[in-house]
């Protein structure tokens, strides 16, 4: 073999070696930086201090709330995952016999994975009412033969609802469903699903193979515009479709207004919904007086026909809370069991003659204040402070350590139009939908 031939062979061998070592099958790019996650799920009651909960279902979501992976805790209540790409994630946890975490209306729990580090977290679950006789339902959500990840799965029976989301492999489990018959369906942008009627739930048993297979493409469309009034900050604003009964967000059904404050939302599935503007924390809320002047923003979709097909909103400035106030990263603040709530004046409600106070629990029930069990537009507030007062100490039933609550503050203005406002006032602002959530130390 000649010298030149040998050099060519060596050169080619070197190229192959460099190519194999550099590409790693990824077209020349190196592997992304990774970290690890170690999560422990424990019983939050004093009767079982830090007892690990076995077989809890932990759904890991990305920063956009899309499922990444689903885990089941071991006998010690632990799940571990190495080699996770670094970044921001969220967690949703559920288990038979326990309330889910986070509860409804509370954003998923945020966690951050850092390069070369193990992020650890201990999350408490609290038992459900021991008088309840419950089972579970499981299945998969599919479109044809493909799994559908991130679909909202809802079971309804005897006026009670149960929700979860499908995992990355399309699987779902609805825990703690009261014994009896329920109807089960799923929602996600762009797909319609049938309802599984009268699914039988038996105590201490999982009713399996309740698969939800898409029946077709969803193509409903709704549009409208936003008008900013009374201190509302003009900005791109979210418009969100939620389930009318559970008030859970329909996955994929959130859009933002354009430069002219218009929006168009497409892919609406069949069902009965509510459409909300400025649901996210952005300093604005829907003018609460709209419920009086326009009615609730309800939407019904039937095979692509949306009624109504247009809906516009007036947006005002929200009542701004100081304690508690949920920061932008959605880390829920912790308060003592006897907190003092504070807020401050803004132009959108500077003319308020008073403020109504409401503290709700994880089930959405008022534990202090509120409107006598009625809608804020129709009821009479039971805990109030006068205009110009921006603080009130909590004086309701004992708040439970480890549990979540939400403070709602409604700005009221006297109005003598008793036809529209039979209680002598109208609402001119309110705290944001996702603000005011706190956990008791």
Residue ranges and their predicted role:
Residues 1-9:
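Bacterial N-terminal signal peptides that target proteins for export
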């Amino acid at each position: 073999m000649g010298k030149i031939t040998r050099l060519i062979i060596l050169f080619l061998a070197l190229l192959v070696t460099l190519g194999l070592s550099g590409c790693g099958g990824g077209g020349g790019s190196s592997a992304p930086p990774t970290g690890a996650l170690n999560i422990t799920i424990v019983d939050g009651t004093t009767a079982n201090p830090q007892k690990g909960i076995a077989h809890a279902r932990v759904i890991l979501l990305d920063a956009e709330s899309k499922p990444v992976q689903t885990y089941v805790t071991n006998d010690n209540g632990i799940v571990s995952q190495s080699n996770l790409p670094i970044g921001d994630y969220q967690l949703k946890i559920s288990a038979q016999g326990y309330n889910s975490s986070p509860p409804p209306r509370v954003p998923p729990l945020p966690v951050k994975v850092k390069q070369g580090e193990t992020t650890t977290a201990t999350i408490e679950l609290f038992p459900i009412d021991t008088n309840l006789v419950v089972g579970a339902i499981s299945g998969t959500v599919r479109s044809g033969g493909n799994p559908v990840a991130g679909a909202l799965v809802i079971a309804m029976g005897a006026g009670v609802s149960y929700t979860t989301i499908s995992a990355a492999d399309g699987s779902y489990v609805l825990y703690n469903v009261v014994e009896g018959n329920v109807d089960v369906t799923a929602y996600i942008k762009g797909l319609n699903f049938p309802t599984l009627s009268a699914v039988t739930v038996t105590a201490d048993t999982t009713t399996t193979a309740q698969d939800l297979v898409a029946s077709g493409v969803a193509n409903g469309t709704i549009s409208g515009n936003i008008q900013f009034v009374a201190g509302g900050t003009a900005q791109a604003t979210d418009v969100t479709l939620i389930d009318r009964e559970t008030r859970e967000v329909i996955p994929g059904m959130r859009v933002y207004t354009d430069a002219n404050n218009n929006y168009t939302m497409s892919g609406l599935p069949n069902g009965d919904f509510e459409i909300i503007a400025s649901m996210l924390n952005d300093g604005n809320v829907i003018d609460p007086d709209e419920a009086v002047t326009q009615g609730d923003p309800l939407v019904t979709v039937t095979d692509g026909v949306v009624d109504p097909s247009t809906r516009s909103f007036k947006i005002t400035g929200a009542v701004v809370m100081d304690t508690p106030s949920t920061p932008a990263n959605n880390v829920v603040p912790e308060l003592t069991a006897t907190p003092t709530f504070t807020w401050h004046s803004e132009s959108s409600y500077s003319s308020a003659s008073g403020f109504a106070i409401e503290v709700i629990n994880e089930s959405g029930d008022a534990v202090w204040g509120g409107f006598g069990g009625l809608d804020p537009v129709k009821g009479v507030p039971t805990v109030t402070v006068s205009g110009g007062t921006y603080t009130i100490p909590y004086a309701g039933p004992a708040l439970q350590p480890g549990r979540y609550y939400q403070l709602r503050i409604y700005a009221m203005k006297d109005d003598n139009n008793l036809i529209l406002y039979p209680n002598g006032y109208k609402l001119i602002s309110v705290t944001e939908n996702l603000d005011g959530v706190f956990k008791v130390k």
